[in-house]
Amino acid sequence: MNRKFFFTGIRSPRSSAIMAKAASTRRVPALIVGGGPVGLYASSLLSAYGVPSLLAERAANGKSHPRAHLINTRSMELLRELGVERQIREQTPPMDEWRHFRYCTSVLGTQIAAQDHMAGREWAALSEMTPSPMAHLSQPKLEAILRAEAERRALGGTELLSGYECVSFAQHGGGVTAQLRRVVSPAASASYGARYSAVGTGADADAAPDALTVEADYLLACDGAHSRVRQALGLRLRGPAPLQHFKSVHFVAPALAPLLRERGLEAMLYFCFNRGAVAVLVAHNISQGEWVAQLPFFPGLQDAEALDRAACTAGIAACLGTLPTGHAATPPSPFTTTSSSPSSSSSSSSSGSSASSVTVVPFEVKSIGSWAMSSKVIERLSLGRGGMQVLTTAPPPLPHR
């Protein structure tokens, strides 16, 4: 029996008109929906076994907001087999920069405790058992490496399409037929420019039609924790309600590197606890000044919209602390652990100093996202029929900004 699935909120009269105007058809053994680490790895692996595929990714030039960063040992072994371990190692920071977790009042403040994760017998034993120990590399950088490898391996008939989304798909006895739409609109073109241009590798890639009909033996759903393919199939994620909500703030602070090195305070994670903020700072690359702040907030008690760039900047300042020459109190922020308003005069007076008198390490906020920490497991990865398979890296869910 044929079954057809439509993604809620995608189809519209306008999109249907576009698809009718400029549709094209592809026939491939495998359709990959999603161009993250798993989708790109799948494309390369299929090419290695002589199987052409078509990969469709909604974003045009990848994602710049750092997300996952720790590549575990088994993943590194698989990436070694793919032939990209050297490129990953070349971009991974020195281990001394990320072997510790630190607990502190602020990054430059009082150090409460530190855990060296590479000092125990377990790490020594693991290092003897594998040629490819774990690495620490930001997901956008890993995706760039995997994209280049997928393009290098692409067979005749293999395509890597950026700026395309899967609108619907139908299962039938011979596999799957899917409808893809190019994500292009006047508003998107004005806002993102080339970001949403379609890029392809392989047969007829230069045509970049507005819509594609793809006939495939298999559909690989690699479109992440919020997979619309998975949702359309009715495959649920089982688990409790979100454990915590966060503002994820990408910022750069190159000036931190020498200050941390001269004090021997490098780490991967900094758990910061002070009157201005309680948060975790993730050092993706200390030498390059690449950081992400995970600032918790509480829906229902806080207005997420009010936690804007200024509020996030204040939270980061509180977590970084003061320069070595400063002795002012920690600046307040909307992520304060006290119940009083961080902008009130009582907050400033109780700290003994106003926020303006505090000198912190210079930094620049690049992007802000929101996500919910959850503990969920998909009920099934395969339907066992119709060529449908769900693949995932299982990262913490972080919605598109």
Spans of features found by a protein language model:
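Core beta-strand elements of the Rossmann-like FAD/NAD(P) dinucleotide-binding domain
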Residues: 26-28, 206-218
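Helical element adjacent to the flavin cofactor pocket in flavoenzyme catalytic cores
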Residues: 134-161, 184-200
